[in-house]
């Protein structure tokens, strides 16, 4: 979005966002992450520059995935949101849905929640025709397999020759007692 706005600090500029309350909550979260970050590149920035914040692409590296999702959802300019979604061969509602699913999945993993046979409360959206087919329409959208398919979809889009399928297969082989059908 920095490229479209010509503003390397767009992420902290309220003019680009639709909901002021959501923007203010986002800024509080950004402040917390920035002020407590121990990342070398953030420490270098603080010691080298006078700006209150680093450029948006640096902030994006330290803020939680859920905050990135809310930033995307709050972008005022729908054309920019559409352009970002099209980078992943998706439309806006599907990208928002999938970002939320990935965030929930990530949070469950980080908090050691059981995920392999869990039924999620969220029902992810699915587009009719995928440019990069991976997810079938008969898959239960509330199970971890669908979340893994979404992650694999993004991996295939960003890093086409990734080894996620191999690693997942190895993981499942390591734990043969897991009922794959429950996923």
Kindly label every feature range from the protein language model.
Residues 1-183:
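Long, contiguous internal "core" modules enriched in hydrophobic/ aromatic residues
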């Amino acid at each position: 979005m920095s490229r479209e706005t010509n503003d390397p600090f767009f992420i902290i500029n309220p003019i680009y966002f639709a909901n002021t309350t959501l923007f203010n909550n986002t800024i509080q979260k950004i402040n917390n992450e920035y002020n407590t970050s121990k990342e070398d590149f953030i420490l270098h920035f603080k010691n080298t520059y006078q700006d209150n914040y680093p450029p948006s692409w640096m902030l994006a590296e330290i803020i939680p995935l859920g905050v990135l999702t809310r930033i995307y959802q709050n972008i005022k300019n729908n054309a920019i949101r559409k352009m970002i979604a099209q980078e992943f061969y998706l439309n806006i509602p599907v990208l928002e849905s999938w970002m939320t699913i990935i965030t929930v999945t990530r949070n469950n993993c980080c908090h050691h929640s059981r995920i392999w046979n869990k039924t999620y409360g969220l029902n992810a959206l699915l587009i009719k025709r995928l440019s990069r087919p991976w997810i079938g329409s008969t898959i239960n959208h509330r199970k971890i397999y669908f979340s893994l398919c979404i992650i694999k979809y993004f991996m295939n889009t960003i890093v086409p020759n990734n080894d996620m399928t191999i690693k997942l297969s190895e993981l499942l082989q390591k734990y043969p007692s897991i009922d794959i059908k429950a996923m």
